[in-house]
Each structure stands twice: as C-alpha cells, then as structure tokens.
Amino acid sequence: MGLMWGLFSVIIASAAQLSLGFAASHLPPMTHLWDFIAALLAFGLDARILLLGLLGYLLSVFCWYKTLHKLALSKAYALLSMSYVLVWIASMVLPGWEGTFSLKALLGVACIMSGLMLIFLPTTKQRY
C-alpha cells in the first residue's frame, strides 16, 4: 500500500511540475510584479494552471505523508527519482515543451532506473 501512495505522489508531483513550468513560461515574469499580479487576478488559463500545479504539489505531499507511514524511508525516498524520469519523458512527448533527447540524459535515466531496481528487487536470504 505504501508503494501505491508513493507512486501516486510521484505522478502527481510530476504533473504539478509540468503545470508550474507551463505557467512560468506563459505568465509575466515576477520582475514585473504588477503585470504578474494583474495576470493572476484576471484568472486566465495561465493562472488556473499555476493554481492546479500548486494544488497538485499539496496533494502530492498528502500522498507522500501516507507513503512514509507505510514504506521504509530508504525505499520511499528512492521513488522520488522517478519524477525526473517522468518529467523528462513528458517534456519530449508533450507538444510545446521542446524537450530534447540526448544520450547523456538517457544514461542518467538508465542509472536512475537501475538504482530503483536494485533497491526494490526482493532480497533473498543467504544461508551459511
């Protein structure tokens, strides 16, 4: 059950990260504070996506809290690295994100996935 909550947390946090990235690229920069505030108060699509991203992070924290009650911290914390993989893949697949593929990034993803496999593979008891 803890693994399920952890995966929910990772998926929701990844979607929230993508939402915040979209909002940040479409809203005025915070260096133009009054324009930024005006865009938030207009509550257009960009502001709503920003709010969804923030609410997504809040929901992700709730799922993470549930994860930590059911799963060892050493395993739970390793799950967070899945978010890097999901966001990288989504940035290449989703239109408008212009994520780039590189062998270096693929090697990083392979390292992350290998590490997760090592952590989550069942251990066998050795007999002496």
From Swiss-Prot:
Keyword entries, A-Z = Cell inner membrane, Cell membrane, Lipid A biosynthesis, Lipid biosynthesis, Lipid metabolism, Lipopolysaccharide biosynthesis, Membrane, Transmembrane, Transmembrane helix, Transport
Q: Which residues lie on this side of the membrane: Periplasmic?
A: 24-35, 98-100
| Quaternary structure annotation from Swiss-Prot or TrEMBL | Heterodimer of ArnE and ArnF.
Gene3D superfamilies listed in its UniProt record: 1.10.3730.20
Topology in the lipid bilayer is annotated as: Multi-pass membrane protein
Family in the record: Belongs to the ArnF family.
What exactly does this protein do?
Translocates 4-amino-4-deoxy-L-arabinose-phosphoundecaprenol (alpha-L-Ara4N-phosphoundecaprenol) from the cytoplasmic to the periplasmic side of the inner membrane.
Metabolic or biological pathway: Bacterial outer membrane biogenesis; lipopolysaccharide biosynthesis
GO MF entry, a single one: carbohydrate derivative transmembrane transporter activity
Principal cellular location given in the protein's record = membrane
Q: Which organism is it from?
A: Escherichia coli O127:H6 (strain E2348/69 / EPEC)
Q: Which residues lie on this side of the membrane: Cytoplasmic?
A: 1-2, 57-76, 122-128
Q: Which superkingdom is the protein from?
A: Bacteria
Coiled-coil stretches, from where to where?
A: none
Subcellular localization is given as: Cell inner membrane
The biological process GO terms on file are: lipid A biosynthetic process; lipopolysaccharide biosynthetic process
Q: Where are the transmembrane segments?
A: 3-23, 36-56, 77-97, 101-121
This protein is called what?
Probable 4-amino-4-deoxy-L-arabinose-phosphoundecaprenol flippase subunit ArnF
Q: Which GO terms describe its cellular component?
A: plasma membrane
